[in-house]
């Protein structure tokens, strides 16, 4: 990236951090903990699902997108290696935020018994095992993809 962008990128990153401080991404206050039941004691059954299938699909899709985080973070780090330090800082912050989103979505689905926990585990495992093979190769393509993925989820 052009070093002349660094002051503006630092400014944008600082603005992001200020906005992020006002949002508590700690999911402990958002989840219906009182609905939680031990799956060994009370096995999952399809009759326990209360969310519409479209909502479940949307949450699962967002979750599975976030699950690719280890691969995508590695890709971003390699793509921007040796770039501006603010980019590296942002990648680390973004990774932390995306991990929180993933944890929130998965925990919500399990607490509300909206999905078969074994099926969700297998889906998650399959996505991570599948890796991430981008078909783009430049920093601008990586930023474009990341922006679209962020807006979609």
Spans of features found by a protein language model:
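Non-heme di-metal
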Residues: 1-153
